[in-house]
Amino acid sequence: PAGQNTCAMKKLFPLIAVLATLCATAAQRPLQLIPQPVRAELREGHFAAPGCKVTAEGFASRPEGLIRVASALAAPHGKQPARKTRNTLLLQLDARAGIPAEGYRLRVAEHEAELTAGDESGIFYGLQTLLQMADADGNIPCAEIEDYPRYGYRGLHLDVCRHFFPVEFVKGYLDRMAAAKLNRFHWHLTDDQGWRIEIKRYPRLTQVGAWRSKSQIGSYE
């Protein structure tokens, strides 16, 4: 029996070693964010977002749209009941902070998350990072993150001229673009030689774009 026990332990040892390695790797795993930030340092503890107070500083007027996005973090998550907390989420707009365009700095502590950017786009993208970091209960790991885009144009194309999609699909497409911090939506609406769709906000699309006087084979005049 002693020999059998020794043999069994020898067989179990590789499995135990693999499990220990996996646990250690999971503990050291960096933040899983898309796209990967320029700098990210994980800290001990977490920030409980549900029930937190959202405040904004440095804006010319109350940023209602950004506060709506932040409120998704403050809302109850999963089956957790609404709870009262003194935790705060600060959105701080500071053009003198030296942060590149569309970039942000994020500091998450146990009772306060502070998001700073030089423009509103940076605040928005920082909120997308917080949404990615939150677990099913709305807990966000404490961390310090600095991020800004390498490219000014980060786009995605959608062709609805040849392939038709419902409105809800297009809205979901835009939501996923925002989550990935893409900032240009290339909407392929028509394959006609002239622009046919009237959009009142952009009248020159039809005033100018619907007409042309010349083509490769001569003039229409």
Residue ranges, per PLM feature:
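Intrinsically disordered, low-complexity sequence elements enriched in Ser/Thr/Gly/Pro
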Residues: 8-9, 27
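Short, linear, compositionally biased motifs with a strong N-terminal bias
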Residues: 18-19, 211
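Acidic, contiguous N-terminal accessory segments
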Residues: 18, 24-154
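A periodicity- and composition-biased signal for non-globular, repetitive helical segments
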Residues: 16-17, 194
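Feature activates predominantly on carbohydrate-active enzymes
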Residues: 98-221
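Short, Lys/Arg-enriched N-terminal segments with co-localized hydrophobic residues
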Residues: 1-8
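Sec-dependent signal peptide recognition
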Residues: 10-16
